């Protein structure tokens, strides 16, 4: 198993404190990995800074060829990546193979093509005898911090646009789920010039702070919690670094009386519980109009209770464990707080399961009120709440009454209503009669405390560039 760091094109052992990496399906230790030392973090950043002088000037074609080679290599090693991700995260193996790996490969291939389409504009003559042009240039060294819910996919979302734009990257995966990023490092070593891509391992307080605070780091890209985002913003503010933040969500799912309730129930069964609900866009905050509320609660209860939990390698498993014991305790505490409210009905689930591993039963909580914590705070687990509403204005007000602003969905047969709401919902994405669907060509990112900046799409590529004005006197 690959456990070494990638620094300046060389795989090396970490020199810091050893950390245990767990299998959440069993609670057992997979292996121990040594963190990067402060000296190694410095070496990785300096290597990236040195490599930028040449990599930043390479042609888009050359950068695209490297990204395509990496995509091909991931595809050729798909089963090994899937097994590592499943073992380290508890994800059902078939979900990683069929859903995640193809999407990861596609992200690298999309940005390989996008790199060759990004261009500045010839702006024209705005001053007599002078011609202005616009350039989009790479920024420099980018520090990327990836989360533990989709370790390899989020690494791809960060690496592909940054490298395509001509930046050099030092990435730190979560210390909870580092295995696929370290495997990726071994493949990238023989594809990219030394220093262009560096992969570290370690905790935020020992490695992340040293990395993001380094004077040579020009940009920090984070996918993580609001608390982590606030910390990084405070930590990097004195140096005025560019930041790119994706900080979670609490997606409202608005279901009107005219919606197809069977489609809603099956949709929430998938979109609310995929990856054990550990998804920033999970369909977790349902608002159902009064006329169909009881019927939807019944249909959802039947749908959610039919989800099969089990071992990740079992092909029939739909729901794996949570990522860590600490997170299991957080989810349990959130549900217990909700259950203590007299008006909450537990339709199904509501507790962790017996036996080994960090499993929590798929849970549906009915009759939640707008002010309840279960409605207002991200749980990030297999937990969905449902709240009754009366009219369009009320549900719009409630949906927007959130510090989050990442994703939302509206379920209705009324096209006019769908357009009205999608124009007024304060979320980076609104789906109509579906949820959770993402493609490489379209941007993903939030507003409010869900952060700013876009992943995927040409907008994501532009986020990793600087806009510069060039004026020529003639």
From Swiss-Prot:
Q: Which residues form the active site?
A: 246, 280
Q: Name one GO molecular function term.
A: aminobutyraldehyde dehydrogenase (NAD+) activity
Q: Which residues form the signal peptide?
A: none
Q: Entry's SUPFAM superfamilies?
A: ALDH-like (SSF53720)
Metabolic or biological pathway, per its Swiss-Prot or TrEMBL entry:
Amine and polyamine degradation; putrescine degradation; 4-aminobutanoate from 4-aminobutanal: step 1/1; Amino-acid degradation
Output one GO BP term: putrescine catabolic process
Q: Which reaction does it catalyse?
A: 4-aminobutanal + NAD(+) + H2O = 4-aminobutanoate + NADH + 2 H(+); 5-aminopentanal + NAD(+) + H2O = 5-aminopentanoate + NADH + 2 H(+)
HAMAP family, sorted? Aldedh_Prr
State the name under which the record lists this protein. Answer: Gamma-aminobutyraldehyde dehydrogenase
Q: Which gene encodes it?
A: patD
